[in-house]
C-alpha cells in the first residue's frame, strides 16, 4: 500500500480525485486539511492532530457508493470500540458519534470518465484534537477528549485499511 503523506493540504479527497491512474489502496494522508470535505457542501474541521485520509478503492461488486460508505462507517466504529472500549453510534450513512457528538465522517465518490475510473473514500476521524472552535464544541468531540490521552493515528489508519481490504475481499468472493 502506497501512502502519500502531507503535512498540510486543502483536501485529501480532492487530491485523490485528481490522480490520473492511481493504484488501488493508495492512501493520501494529511496531518492537517485547510478545506476538508464532508457530504454535500459540508466542511470538515481538520486541524493538526486528527486522522484525515482518502483511499483509492479497488473495483468492487459493490456499485452503490452509499453501501461502501456504510461499510466504512461500521469499520471505523468497530476500530474505535475494539481499541478504546468506547460505544460509537453510527448515524447512517456516513457519520459516527460518541455521546451525541460527531467524531468521524466518511465520504465516497466516483471519478468518472467514459466509465467509472475509480472510487475514492475520504475518512476524517477526530483523534488527537484537544479542543474545537466555539461553533463546533457542542457538536464535535475527539478520542483525545474522551480518553484524556493521545492515540496512535498510524495504528488506527492501518487497522481501518486492513479491515476495509478484508471486507471488500470477502464481498468479492
Label for each model-derived stretch:
Residues 20, 60-63, 67-88, 98-173:
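Long, positively charged amphipathic alpha-helical accessory segments at protein N-termini or as interdomain linkers
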Amino acid at each position: 500500500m502506497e501512502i502519500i503523506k502531507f503535512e498540510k493540504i486543502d483536501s485529501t479527497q480532492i487530491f485523490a480525485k485528481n490522480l490520473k491512474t492511481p493504484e488501488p489502496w493508495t492512501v493520501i494522508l494529511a496531518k492537517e486539511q485547510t478545506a476538508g470535505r464532508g457530504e454535500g457542501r459540508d466542511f470538515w474541521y481538520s486541524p493538526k492532530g486528527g486522522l484525515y485520509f482518502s483511499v483509492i478503492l479497488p473495483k468492487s461488486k459493490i456499485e452503490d457508493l452509499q453501501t461502501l460508505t456504510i461499510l466504512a462507517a461500521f469499520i471505523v466504529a468497530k476500530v474505535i470500540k475494539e481499541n478504546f472500549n468506547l460505544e460509537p453510534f453510527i448515524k447512517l450513512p456516513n457519520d459516527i458519534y460518541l455521546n451525541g457528538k460527531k467524531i468521524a465522517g466518511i465520504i465516497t465518490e466516483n471519478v468518472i470518465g467514459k466509465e467509472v475510473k475509480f472510487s475514492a473514500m475520504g475518512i476524517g476521524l477526530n483523534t488527537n484534537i484537544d479542543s474545537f472552535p466555539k461553533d463546533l464544541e457542542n457538536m464535535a468531540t475527539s478520542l483525545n477528549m474522551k480518553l484524556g490521552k493521545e492515540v496512535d493515528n498510524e495504528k488506527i489508519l492501518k487497522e481501518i485499511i486492513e479491515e476495509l481490504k478484508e471486507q471488500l475481499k470477502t464481498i468479492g468472493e
